Amino acid sequence: MAEQKRDYYEVLGITPDADQSEIKKAFRKLAKKYHPDRNNAPDAAKIFAEINEANDVLSNPKKRANYDKYGFDGVDGEPAFNFQADVFQSFFEEIAKSGVFNNQTNPEQKEKKKRYHWFSKKPKQEQPEINLDHVVEQTIKKVQQNQNQNKDPDELRSKVPGEVTASDWEALVGDTRYGYFDETGDWSWKGYFDEQGKWVWNEPVDSETSEVSVEPEPTPVAPEASFEEAQPEINAEPEASFESTPTPEPVAPEASFEEAQPEPTPIPEPIPTPVQVQPLLLDLNLFTIPTKATKDDLLFDNINLTTYEQVVDYLNSQATPNLAKTDGELQTIDGTNPLLLEQCKKIKKQAEQLFKKLFLKKQLPFITQPEVVEESKTSFDENNVNLVYFEKVPEILFINQQPKEVKYTRQVFDGLTNKTTSETITLEIQLLQTPKETVSAIFKGFGNDHGKGCGDLKIVFEKIKSPFFQVNEDGLHSACIIDPLVAYNGGIIDVFGPYTNFQVKVDGEIDINAIMKFEKLGIAKTKRKGDLFVHLYYSSVPKKKLTTNPQVQQFLELLQAEYELLQDNIKSLKYFKNNLVIPKKPLDQQSYQYLSQEPIS
């Protein structure tokens, strides 16, 4: 089993919001400490390579942006240097050039060097002493130069000879015109760079500097995400215990037809192709990522979000001393992803245009507006709610009963410093299939803390209706566009289930508006609603020769875009699980919180 990597920020001992100067400072300090020539520990070389790997990613704006968004998956495909070959070699080259260790390990060579200076006819010039700190600085510069070779030409700003800017500060280390090495071996500057990047001397000198405008760095571009069809495995720390639903054996779809006319005509049973069904339903626990203020507040275990009742064990910890009523104003956070919302609108618009070509309305005939469901009367006490999290979620996540990651920031008052700080909390909430358009839950003690106790957090999820699926009393309903020639002569058609599509071979003479029934391929975890009903609609234009019907192909692409919404959520969960930190101490309390939902009859 491969050893799990440590978080790059943890390796360098910095926070995720650290700037480039802090990253360089941390790298220099750790590189000097764990360099194999100075540290004889068995794992020094391994730690040194780990430090350089973290610096290689975090010091590169593009790689750092990808790592912050996708974790190790975002940088695994990026070209990287060989740590053993490049980093150590660069250190040894600088050491060899400087002669730091030669003078210490070879007295004869040192004596020869002295005699050479004694008999040299050239006047003796004062040379700055080069120590290991300077070697580390030069190695940082060389590694960053290697990184610059992979950058776009537009990112590399050309320098005018003799021009000094703030971005050149590394090249000036060791230049006695701009600084000197003190008695401790540290480099001291004779001036500084102002906010405009202009060099300013500490004392008046006869040197002119020109002001240069620094171009802003380009915004990092995230790599285009690609999602696999199969469900990714979710790994956790050994201390974490995640319960997952056992995967049933693959079941081949048994298709039968039901006619919409009063007198149905018997149709031969189609021969389905073998299909491996891998349910995407996950039964996972609820955890929060520990921060400085919430480390003692992780009192959650065995979360089971399968009922509409609310049960709460009040939390008592250093982070939440009490749950008294707070005086803070109500704060609302909109966690809706604007890109996801725009993608859902685009899918719906293109689907409506296709339905019009099929002589249908703006939606499929079997999709109807759900009946208004009255809010269930719960024991929710919203008097202490001072933080509301709202997010629009695609309906396909509810249909597949997916966990949903909720990441928000709250305000926490520190009684020791009398200051209010911000902390980020990540919750994972199980979504359930429900006729409601909106579901909500209240989490005690997860709101803002203004000094008089932590308030409560209210989470509200609103469905983004799917134009292709609907859950009715008898099961899950979807659609299929079929070419008229295939319907008459028979062939292979694409059928769409709750989380993937599969191909089925059908015989000819299929009437329009026929219904195919697939047992146990609907929504899992239910017995009465476990079937899938596929409504067949003719395309308005037939295919030409051996080409694919354009309307059938367009419908397939739209459904694939709908499935990508589901795969995107799964990928986000995988990243969350891989970076999950679980406290090693046994949990002495539990807190159970359930979504407010009507029971499914």
Curated annotation (Swiss-Prot):
InterPro entries: DnaJ_C (IPR002939), DnaJ_domain (IPR001623), DnaJ_domain_CS (IPR018253), EAGR_box (IPR022466), EAGR_sf (IPR038145), J_dom_sf (IPR036869). GO terms for cellular component: cytoplasm. PROSITE patterns: DNAJ_1, DNAJ_2. Residues 263-272 have a biased composition (Pro residues). Residues 143-163, 205-272 are annotated as: Disordered. It comes from the Bacteria. Keywords: Chaperone. This is DnaJ-like protein MG200. It comes from Mycoplasma genitalium (strain ATCC 33530 / DSM 19775 / NCTC 10195 / G37) (Mycoplasmoides genitalium).
